[in-house]
Amino acid sequence: MSISSSTKEEISLKKFKEKVINDFRTVSLSREVSIQGRREVLLGKGKFGIFGDGKELPQVVMSHFFKDGDYRSGYYRDQTLLMSQNLLSAREIFAAVYGHPDKLYEKMSGGRQMAGHFLTNTIDENNNWIDQTSQKNHISDISPTASQMSRLVGLGLASKIYRNNSINGSEKFSKNGNEVVWGTIGNASTSQGIFFEAINACGVLQIPSIISVWDDDYGISVHNKDHTTKESISKALAGFKITSDSPGIEILEVKGWDYQSLMKTYSYAEKIAREHHIPVIILSLIHI
């Protein structure tokens, strides 16, 4: 199996086994962190007890196609992605749960943000720009649900502008507009107006974005039938789907527990988003 979609990268069976085992290790550790973290919050020892349980496998798969220079605009269930990228440890997650004020231990915000709000730096300690093309970038998460969508549009549009325009001094920000912005959102938040506005903007502007929707069949305690037309956001958005004679958005569905299908789906999504600037929505069915 190839891990990269843009170029066919042949790997040995031994190397492939190592990747699969490492993914399993990350998924297992992240799930245990979620279980123990929720316990600490319910016992009153920590703050904010929403973690990434149930979304682990799609996120480790996503990490294989998330390249240096790319950006994430997501929310508080994305811990597994950062763990898979070696940007977050179990110890650091608990430092955030306990609100540790020292950035040496809680390096995301030094306890200033809610737990589960992730970021990477864009400037160094001397206020100089960091080379964003040589790192995996995570824009600082914010609390209002679906608010990540408008930021996703801006980040994706930046890549398009860099590809279509020669901009002096852009070496630390883009490699000819080959960056993808990766969005994550829960199925309940897709019922919000800001989501539909952002999706429409992605389709109109044709920006390089891949939006993963985690579909648990429920949004908190509300079933899909009570907040989503046709009980499926991919069906509700069918009119946005790209066709042979009209640009739009590629809309895909995949079972969130199917490792092989997830690999194929994200490989295809990354290829068309990165190379052709076609926006993609992936509905990951966690509950089936």
Which stretches of residues belong to each language-model region?
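Conserved phosphate-handling catalytic cores of large alpha/beta enzymes
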Residues: 224-228, 232-236, 246-278
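Generic recognition of stable, solvent-exposed alpha-helical segments in well-folded globular domains
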Residues: 22, 28, 32, 57, ...
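Intrinsically disordered or highly flexible coil/loop and linker segments, enriched in small
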Residues: 33-37, 71, 103, 107, ...
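Conserved small/polar residues in nucleotide/adenosyl-binding loops
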Residues: 286-288
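Cofactor-binding active-site loop characterized by glycine-rich and histidine/acidic residues
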Residues: 45-207, 212, 219, 223-241, ...
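Cofactor-/ligand-binding subdomain signature composed of acidic, glycine-rich
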Residues: 1-47, 68, 76-78
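Active-site-proximal beta-strand/loop segments in catalytic clefts of secreted hydrolases
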Residues: 213-215, 256
